[in-house]
Regions:
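N-terminal donor/sugar-recognition subdomains of glycan-related enzymes
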Residues: 2-148, 155-172, 181-185, 192, ...
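A structural signal for short, well-ordered beta-strand segments and their strand-loop junctions
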Residues: 17-20, 175, 220, 242, ...
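Glycine-rich phosphate/pyrophosphate-binding loops
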Residues: 20, 179-180, 187-197, 275-301
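Short, basic, glycine/proline-bearing loop/turn elements
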Residues: 146-150, 194-196, 250-261, 322-332
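Extended, hydrophobic alpha-helical segments in both membrane/secreted and soluble proteins
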Residues: 173-179, 219, 268-271, 287
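Phosphate/pyrophosphate-binding betaalpha-module
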Residues: 220-221, 225-226
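Active-site/ligand-binding-proximal alpha/beta "capping" segment
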Residues: 227-290
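Phosphate-binding loop/pocket of nucleotide- and phosphate-handling active sites
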Residues: 297-347
Length: 509
């Protein structure tokens, strides 16, 4: 307690966060010293580790100011007493580090990636506006089925296909783009096929013609998908729609009928979240291994891109080991699957807490997904699927031609305006950049020039204020600038906390 009081005397310490397993120790401290004002202002925060759940970790690591200073995170032991709980401390540290990483990744780290998404979104706009809207989907199909089965392409999928075929009429079947050709091969018709990747390789899952099989399937595409995806679907007159996630450029266009829902990092996450919004009570996962099979396979044997994953098992071995399904030892995972799994675990916790949805992991293999109920697929079929659904589901209609033309014209105008915003922004800040760069070059040759240092800092602050104003007023720029500014601020925090002791230290800072 005395240590906390001393640390809190330093005005630079905005918050002190204490993780404590034995909360009685904290109560004793509160009886001895008065921390009422520090607790009320949240300068002192006490979290009992045994009561922390996935959602709390995620919210903590993505909130201000903790996220902004995530690159200088460290977990400090208060005394040697806590060394006896080293396993608990290491586990806590592991969770915090992972959640900070996930939060950073969720903000993006590449402006070029953001630009690719915007470019493909603009290219897809005519297809989105002239096809059925997300609003139409929700109005006609929400709540018509209790149980959703989400089909992914993990190594365990093959053994589940016979049961899936037998019970397909009794559940809503959502499948990943990569699972679609596999289900077609086994004549198992999904109700929804989802796709969200931006790359042309993923579009190739639709470069086929399954004829009558495709009738009544709805292909739901994230509005960022590669244009080849819609080209292949149009070629065979398949039913598709484009749906938007929450993003500043998309929101700027105000095409609200065609969104919005968060789609996560993978098509399996997207399937899961759409199943939530369509008001299913139970969600069953199959083929969701998120780990390599014992023989090193990354996907089911029918997966068309197996050759693209050769050598990955050897590359990842012993780097991303995690708990196995059914608590059967450990399995080998990958960086991307670990990210997907953590994203899934957050979604599962959210679905249970806020939507009262039960998630069953019936993969019977792969990695454990915390928060799911692990059951054999046969159990789920026999206990959750009792009657045939009224399939095919109600047909979706596009907007009227007049409404389509109205949205197309408004979107064109907004895109044109955004291009102008970007050009104005570029021209203005290139001049400011050149000025600061020239000043900085002069500074390197004159370390004693404190006046010049102050002038440079003043110019930088002025530009930062201007960027902040644009960031808050021109929402279309946010999506492009967001990843760059976030990474810049995270790195700047490392410099911000430095405490210069000499003039040279101040100069370097």
């Amino acid at each position: 307690g005395i240590l906390f009081k001393a640390l809190l005397q330093n005005k630079n310490h905005q918050h002190i966060v204490v993780f404590e397993k034995d909360i009685e120790i904290i109560w004793i401290m509160f009886h001895i010293l008065d921390f009422s004002s520090e607790l009320q202002s949240a300068r002192l925060m006490v979290l009992q580790t045994s009561s922390l759940d996935i959602e709390l970790f995620s919210n903590f690591c993505s909130s201000k100011p903790f996220f902004q200073f995530s690159r200088i995170y460290f977990l400090e032991l208060m005394s040697h007493y806590y060394e006896r709980f080293h396993e608990d401390v290491l586990e806590l540290n592991k969770k915090l580090v992972q959640d900070f990483k996930d939060s950073i990744l969720s903000h993006g780290n590449d402006p070029l990636d953001a630009l690719q998404g915007i470019e493909q979104f603009v290219y897809n706009l005519p297809q989105m506006i002239t096809h059925p809207s997300y609003k139409e989907l929700l109005s006609k199909r929400k709540g018509i089925s209790d149980t959703a089965i989400i089909v992914s392409t993990g190594p365990s999928l093959t053994k589940q296909l016979p049961l899936l075929k037998k019970y397909a009429s009794k559940a809503t079947i959502f499948c990943a783009d990569s699972s679609y050709p596999i289900l077609a091969k086994h004549n198992i018709k999904p109700d929804y096929v989802l796709s969200l990747e931006r790359i042309p390789l993923t579009s190739e899952f639709f470069n086929n013609d399954f004829g009558e099989f495709d009738k009544d399937i709805l292909f739901v595409l994230k509005s960022y998908v590669h244009p080849h995806t819609t080209k292949y679907l149009q070629k065979n007159n398949r039913n598709f729609m484009l749906v938007s996630t929450y993003a500043s450029f998309i929101n700027y266009l105000k095409l609200d009928d065609f969104g919005y829902f968060n789609m996560g990092f993978s098509v399996a996450n997207m399937n899961f979240l759409l199943a939530i919004h369509l008001k299913h009570k139970n969600i069953v996962l199959i083929g969701q291994d998120l780990a390599y099979a014992k023989d090193g396979l990354s996907h089911t044997k029918d997966y068309s891109n197996l050759d693209k994953h050769e050598g990955h098992f050897q590359r990842d071995k012993n780097k991303y080991t995690t708990q196995a399904y059914g608590d059967n030892g450990k399995v080998e995972s990958s960086f991307v699957w670990t990210l997907f799994r953590h994203n899934f675990e957050q979604d599962v916790a959210n679905a249970k807490k806020n939507y009262y949805i039960t998630t069953y992991n019936c993969t019977e293999g792969g990695a454990r997904i915390e928060g799911t109920i692990e059951k054999p697929f046969l159990w789920a079929c026999e206990n959750l699927l009792h009657k045939d659904l009224n399939k095919p589901f109600e047909k979706l209609e596009p907007l009227s031609l007049n409404k389509q033309n109205e949205f197309l014209l408004k979107a064109y105008y907004k895109v044109y305006q955004s291009i102008k915003h970007c050009r104005d922004f570029s021209n203005k800040f290139i001049k400011s950049y050149d000025k600061i760069k020239n000043s900085f070059m002069s500074l390197q040759n004159s370390q004693e020039n404190e006046t010049l240092i102050k002038e440079i800092i003043k110019d930088i602050d002025k530009i930062k204020t201007q960027i902040d104003e644009l960031y808050n007023t021109q929402k279309d720029l946010m999506q492009i600038l967001g990843p760059l500014l976030t990474q810049f601020e995270l790195n700047l925090a490392r410099i911000y906390v430095l405490n210069p002791k000499t003039k040279e230290d101040a100069f370097n800072k």
